[in-house]
C-alpha cells in the first residue's frame, strides 16, 4: 500500500503531499487537522479527492486560493465539485476544481461586499447548455443553504459555463465567445426587423443553436455547401433576411478572422426569414 508524505497542510481539509515522487493535492474533511510536514498518510485515510495538477502554475495558483479561502467556503466548493461530477458522471475534474474554487471564492467575497456582477449572456447559456444550467441551479441552491447567503440568479449562468466546459468539447473562452456572438447577432436582427426577439420561442432556440454550430464548424474548418441555384433563390426571394444574415456573417468573420461562405449565409437567412414570419403573424 502506498503512502503520501505531507509537504504542507493548507488547512484542515486540504494538504499538499508527494506520492511516487509527484506532488499531489489531497482533499478530505479534517484530513489536515494537526498534520505537519514530513508526516505520512496511507491510502486508507479519509481522502475524498486526489488531484495531480500537471502544470506548476496551476498548482501554485490553487494553493494560493486555498490559503485565502474560508474553510466553510472551501468545503462547500468541494461538495459542489463532488455533486457536479456525480451528476454528470465525469471523473477528470482537476480543471473544474481549480476553476470553481477560483470563481466561488471571489463570487462569495463580492457578495459579502455587495458587489454584484451581472451576466449579460445568462439567457444564451441557459438555452445552449440547459443540462449544465439545471445542475448549476442546484449548485447555487446548495451553496446558498450551506453558506447562509443568497447568490444572485446570474451566478447560475457563470457556474453552468464551468460545468459545460468540463463535459463538452469547448473551453470557457470558446463558450463565452459563442455567447457574445449570439448576443450580437440577435441585436443585429432586432435592429433590422425593428422588433424585439422573444427568447422563449423554439425559433430562437433553433437560431442560437445554428450560430453555435456555425462557429464550431468555422473553428474546425468544416464547411457546408449549398447549390448555386439554392443560394440565388434565397437571395431573390428573401432579400431582407439575406441582407441581415450578411451583416451577421461579417460581424462573426471579424471576430474569428475566418471567411464565411455564401452557403452559410443563406442558411442563416432562412432562420432570419422565420423570425420575419413570426413577427408578421403576431401582427395579424
From Swiss-Prot:
<keyword id="KW-0677">Repeat</keyword>
<feature type="domain" description="PRD 1">
    <location>
        <begin position="65"/>
        <end position="173"/>
    </location>
</feature>
<dbReference type="Pfam" id="PF00874">
    <property type="entry name" value="PRD"/>
</dbReference>
<feature type="domain" description="PRD 2">
    <location>
        <begin position="174"/>
        <end position="282"/>
    </location>
</feature>
<protein>
    <recommendedName>
        <fullName>Protein GlcT</fullName>
    </recommendedName>
</protein>
<comment type="similarity">
    <text>Belongs to the transcriptional antiterminator BglG family. GlcT subfamily.</text>
</comment>
<dbReference type="GO" id="GO:0045893">
    <property type="term" value="P:positive regulation of DNA-templated transcription"/>
</dbReference>
<dbReference type="InterPro" id="IPR036650">
    <property type="entry name" value="CAT_RNA-bd_dom_sf"/>
</dbReference>
<dbReference type="InterPro" id="IPR050661">
    <property type="entry name" value="BglG_antiterminators"/>
</dbReference>
<dbReference type="InterPro" id="IPR011608">
    <property type="entry name" value="PRD"/>
</dbReference>
<dbReference type="InterPro" id="IPR036634">
    <property type="entry name" value="PRD_sf"/>
</dbReference>
<dbReference type="InterPro" id="IPR004341">
    <property type="entry name" value="CAT_RNA-bd_dom"/>
</dbReference>
<dbReference type="InterPro" id="IPR001550">
    <property type="entry name" value="Transcrpt_antitermin_CS"/>
</dbReference>
<dbReference type="Pfam" id="PF03123">
    <property type="entry name" value="CAT_RBD"/>
</dbReference>
<dbReference type="GO" id="GO:0003723">
    <property type="term" value="F:RNA binding"/>
</dbReference>
